């Protein structure tokens, strides 16, 4: 494998693919890795308009447009059967009654101190639309970061942690806070990341720790922290789960979505957890977990499967896990060691990773400098392909690997370039998910149609091609876009697609044909 091939492999695994200008820069893989680490050192939270949804008492409205531009006067609520004369204030209905008391178990779902059950169907519909819009905006803002940010390694690490610490809640503010906690510590020390995520209201709600009290312990949070986040099955006992649950009693959150330790709900008695006895707190449990050698091995194995190969190699994992633990669980140090290893560039680890839907979409946009006019169809493609950001299927996250591919998703994957760049006709009615963030969509609302308005600038690719004769351009572009050698019969198909076209159109046809090959699904 030559240096150029190693560079492309690095950019695909440590980010979302190389741009033509990255290839033209001619950096060695070692220098490119240093640049990736440098560019990803700074934490920048995901912020922007429309990323949150607040529905304070009396501002639920039936017209989606009016909620964004016309607040209701006097904190009242309007309904469709109460039309107001032109220029006159809308006729109000009775304001919603405040919640009598907070009893735990949920974060107010976009309606602070209001009972969701008391909303009218119209009000509930408007709430669902507001929540859905906020999550859609969060997803598109993050996809933009993946496609355009120079902090490629941080974005890829955030995607990894997004699946590792899988969480699904209805509250955009809570989901965004959790996301930014992962973003902040994505390349820092894992103990800091673990504590921050564990004390996020979204995670505490998702894993039921708001109901974990000394009189009635709830084991769900403690069990998942060990099974999915730190140790893996077989490295703790049921007694450890029960004792850890006692240590986490009292961990919750307040109305403002802030972590709150409720001392009166905490079990302050002695506990024995993983061989350690004492008046252990939740923080003590998390710290003690990371003293176990199994924790480093478990975490490094998950990192290896995501960034290197779905089949772990113990000869690679054991020294990485040892160094990871010795470094105090320094994530940036782990990733530098992994991407610097000679075995990372072995043929068995190149072009063997099936791109997730998000990697596929972000990769097309990044490698070709694609500009998108309308990102809404891309959200539908995420879901149709099986990966909607902020909506993992369960606490275990997305299974990945070959699970990304079935007959229907493969068809959409292969047609996606034509849909994006030729506005080809393709409509798919998405299945209704009982756990939808905003449920009860109509079939029309669940139908994805073309219209992203994807613009494919040719100048960077023309510079990459330089003086390459037109007949050889498909092969050269295949070396840039594909991580595995193109088969002769596929190269012939690509060449035929570009025949009898003027140069710009021939280049565009070549690109669409290459992106439509099965080989492009691999990184």
List each model region and its residues.
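Flexible, low-complexity segments enriched for small/polar residues
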Residues: 2-3, 8-22, 50, 54, ...
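Hydrophobic/aromatic residues in well-formed alpha-helices
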Residues: 7, 23, 32-33, 241, ...
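Alpha-helix C-capping/helix-to-loop hinge sites
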Residues: 14-17, 145-146, 164, 168, ...
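Surface-exposed patches in mature extracellular/periplasmic domains of secreted proteins
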Residues: 19-26, 170, 194, 241, ...
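Active-site substrate-binding loop specific to GH73 endo-beta-N-acetylglucosaminidase modules
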Residues: 99-104, 108-124, 131, 135-142, ...
């Amino acid at each position: 494998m030559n240096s150029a091939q190693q560079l492309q492999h690095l950019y695909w695994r440590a980010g979302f693919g190389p741009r033509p200008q990255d290839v033209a820069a001619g950096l060695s893989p070692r220098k490119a890795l240093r640049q990736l680490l440098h560019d990803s050192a700074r934490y920048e939270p995901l912020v922007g308009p429309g990323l949150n949804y607040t529905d304070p008492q009396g501002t639920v409205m039936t017209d989606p447009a009016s909620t964004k531009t016309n607040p209701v006067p006097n904190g009242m609520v309007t309904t469709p059967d109460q039309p107001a004369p032109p220029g006159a204030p809308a006729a109000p209905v009775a304001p919603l009654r405040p919640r009598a008391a907070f009893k735990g178990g949920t974060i107010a779902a976009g309606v602070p101190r209001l009972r969701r059950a008391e909303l009218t169907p119209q009000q509930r519909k408007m709430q669902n639309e507001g929540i859905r819009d906020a999550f859609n905006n969060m997803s598109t803002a993050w996809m933009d970061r993946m496609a355009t940010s120079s902090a490629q390694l941080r974005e890829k690490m955030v995607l990894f942690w997004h699946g590792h610490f899988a969480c699904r809640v209805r509250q955009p503010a809570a989901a965004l806070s959790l996301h930014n906690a992962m973003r902040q510590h994505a390349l820092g020390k894992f103990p800091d990341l673990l504590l921050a995520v564990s004390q996020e209201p979204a995670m505490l709600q998702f894993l039921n720790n708001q109901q974990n009290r000394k009189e009635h312990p709830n084991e769900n949070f403690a069990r998942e922290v060990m099974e999915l986040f730190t140790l893996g099955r077989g490295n703790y006992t049921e007694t450890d789960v029960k004792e850890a649950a006692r240590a986490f009693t009292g961990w919750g959150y307040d109305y403002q979505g802030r972590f709150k330790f409720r001392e009166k709900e905490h079990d302050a008695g002695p506990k024995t957890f993983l061989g350690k006895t004492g008046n252990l707190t939740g923080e003590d449990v998390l710290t003690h977990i990371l003293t176990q050698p199994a924790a480093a091995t478990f975490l490094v194995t998950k990192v290896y499967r995501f960034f290197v190969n779905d089949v772990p190699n113990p000869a690679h994992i054991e020294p990485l896990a040892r160094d990871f633990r010795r470094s105090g669980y320094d994530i940036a140090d782990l990733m530098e060691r992994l991407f610097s290893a000679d075995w990372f560039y072995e043929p068995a680890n190149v072009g063997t990773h099936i791109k997730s839907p998000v990697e596929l979409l972000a990769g097309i946009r990044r490698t070709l400098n694609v500009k998108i006019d309308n990102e809404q169809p891309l959200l539908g493609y995420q879901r149709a392909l099986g990966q909607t950001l902020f909506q993992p299927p369960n606490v275990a996250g997305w299974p990945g690997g070959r699970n990304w591919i079935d007959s229907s998703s493969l068809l959409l994957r292969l047609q996606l370039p034509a849909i994006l760049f030729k506005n080809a006709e393709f409509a798919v009615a998405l299945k209704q998910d009982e756990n939808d963030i905003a449920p009860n969509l109509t079939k029309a609302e669940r139908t994805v149609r073309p219209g992203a308005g994807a613009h494919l600038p040719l100048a960077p690719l023309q510079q990459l091609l330089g003086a390459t004769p037109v007949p050889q351009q498909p092969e050269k572009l295949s070396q840039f876009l594909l991580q595995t050698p193109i088969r002769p019969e596929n190269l012939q198909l690509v060449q035929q697609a570009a025949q009898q076209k003027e140069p710009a159109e021939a280049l565009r046809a070549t690109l669409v044909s290459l992106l439509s090959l099965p080989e492009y699904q691999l990184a």
